[in-house]
Amino acid sequence: MKCEHIIWDWNGTLLDDVWLSVQSINTVLSRYELPQITTSRYLDIFTFPVIEYYKLLGFNFDTDPFEKVGTEFINEYTYNQYLPKLHKDLIKVLKEINDLKVSQSLVSAATQKMLDKLIHYHKLANYFETVIGQDNHYAYGKEDTVSKWLDARSLDPSHVLFIGDTIHDHEVAINSGMQSLLISHGHTSRERLLKTGTIVLPNLNSFIYWFKESTQ
């Protein structure tokens, strides 16, 4: 496998924030007297665009617009945004990728402002060539921003590896002509990820071993 650049997804892939997403949405659900969800249920239904996930949760957008409910979730999440930790072995993996002379970037469905704050807080900026966020907090998806980023680069998309934790991440990679790899410690169950047919690994440590073997 030839790989000149890696694009990492942020939430779930590098940041261990599933618990906060479940906690935050349950706070909002209780506000609307809707059933709480378990982490297992969350991993089985979370999807992009997240408006579809909100529909599965039971929200009625005729009475409570998605923009209102989505903002309430973001407010809950943002209040605790510095509590989630980085996934185990992340710093080691980022350093090893740099040592292999492979450049790295980061993309998220979060706003650019939130993403920049978190990258600074976790002292990760030096590892990434580019940090790509969104201009709104409604998490419609990443495909447009990633596509524009690729268009502005001289990279061959087939030599770029996109690493994420959702089916949407896989779709972004394939639709943009990139290689795809998924890690199952994030926002989607392993069973759902395997249905994409792409490589699914359990954690970051297993990824670095796979990457070294695959790029020899």
Segments from the language model and where they lie:
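Glycine-rich phosphate-binding loop signature in dinucleotide/nucleotide-binding domains
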Residues: M1, D99-V102, A152-H159, S214-T215
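A short, structured active-site edge motif that brings together acidic residues
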Residues: Y42, A125-Y140
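Acidic, Mg2+-coordinating phosphoryl-transfer loop and its flanking beta/alpha structural elements
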Residues: L161-L201
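Conserved Lys-Pro-Asp/Glu-containing loop-to-beta segment of HAD-superfamily phosphomonoesterases
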Residues: H5, K142-E171
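Short, acidic loop-to-helix structural element flanking the phosphoryl-transfer center
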Residues: Y79-L106, Q112, D116, E143
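N-terminal helical cap/lid subdomain that shapes the substrate entry/recognition surface
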Residues: C3-I91
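Conserved H-loop
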Residues: P35, A125-E129, D156, L201
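Short beta->alpha linker loops
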Residues: I45, K85-D89, A110, H137, ...
